[in-house]
Amino acid sequence: MASVSTHGNQEKSPHLPPLSKQSLLFCPKSKLHIHRGEIAKIIRECQEESFWKRALPFSLISMLVTQGLVHQGYLAANPRFGSLPKVALAGLLGFGLGKASYIRVCQSKFHSFEDQLRGAGFGPEHNRHCLLTCEDCKTRRGLSEKAGSQPSAS
């Protein structure tokens, strides 16, 4: 014999909190499509591209320029360590400036990805209101409007 469920046909997702724990601003449909794999891919691309396209070239160029300035006599070499401290500092500064100069490119990648997911629960405003019109959202919006329209007894 087949066992019969006493709970009926509930189609609750296992990853959604119960209705009593959800806020009025929660939209169940928007939580279903968080593309963590694609976000991780964009982060990895940004790290690799910023290193190879900006940080490494800036670092090498600044180190070569600094070594040239020390060799020409425009910068004094350290008596104990030679040109190493100045070249190392120039390399670190070039690396940092190269990474920082690539920030706008990464931001544009995230903005283009956000435009693809508009209304799917991505970005800083995804929890503020429900952009999708699901039945749960409609009933909650109706309940909150009724509760807010009752006059106080004061």
From Swiss-Prot:
Primary location recorded for the protein, binned into one broad class: other
Cellular localisation: Endosome; Mitochondrion; Mitochondrion inner membrane
TM helices/strands, residue ranges: none
UniProt cross-references to InterPro entries, sorted A to Z: OCAD1/2, OCIA_dom
Record key words, sorted: Acetylation, Endosome, Membrane, Mitochondrion, Mitochondrion inner membrane
Disulfide bonds: none
Superkingdom in the source lineage: Eukaryota
Domain spans labelled OCIA: 1-120
Gene Ontology CC annotation, any one: mitochondrial inner membrane
Tissues/organs with expression: Abundant in kidney, liver and brain.
Role played: Has an essential role in the assembly of mitochondrial respiratory chain complex III. Is also required for STAT3 activation and plays a role in cell migration.
Summary of subunit composition and partner proteins: Interacts (via OCIA domain) with OCIAD1/ASRIJ and STAT3.
Protein name listed in UniProt: OCIA domain-containing protein 2
Source organism: Mus musculus
Gene name per UniProt: Ociad2
